Amino acid sequence: ISHIAEASESRFVMEDWHNFGSDYDKTLMAWHERFNQAWPELSSRYSATFRRMFNYYLCACAGAFRARDIELWQVLFSRGVEGGIRVYR
């Protein structure tokens, strides 16, 4: 984090820094649920091996986000906006 701030401070203003990690866990689990609900329609195009691997990928990534082993950050930079940028969540 400090490297990003240090490298950008002479060029940009860091307006916002947001962690989406806990949201991405929920997103991955929603994709997992929708993928498996849609499997009857997808099964003619994808193998059972692909299904197992994709389920493993989605669940492993969701678990890593849940355990906070990985993070997803969005950093908003500007060249300087008078009054700053208001970010709504």
Swiss-Prot record:
Keywords: Cytoplasm, Lipid biosynthesis, Lipid metabolism, Methyltransferase, S-adenosyl-L-methionine, Transferase. It holds the Pfam family CMAS. GO terms for cellular component: cytoplasm. Its main location: cytoplasm. It is an enzyme of class 2 (transferase). GO terms for biological process: lipid metabolic process; methylation. It is found in: Cytoplasm. Its EC number is 2.1.1.79. GO terms for molecular function: cyclopropane-fatty-acyl-phospholipid synthase activity. The active site is at C61. It catalyses: a 1-acyl-2-(9Z)-enoyl-sn-glycero-3-phospholipid + S-adenosyl-L-methionine = a 1-acyl-2-(9-cyclopronane)-acyl-sn-glycero-3-phospholipid + S-adenosyl-L-homocysteine + H(+). Transfers a methylene group from S-adenosyl-L-methionine to the cis double bond of an unsaturated fatty acid chain resulting in the replacement of the double bond with a methylene bridge. Belongs to the CFA/CMAS family. This is Cyclopropane-fatty-acyl-phospholipid synthase. It comes from Citrobacter freundii.
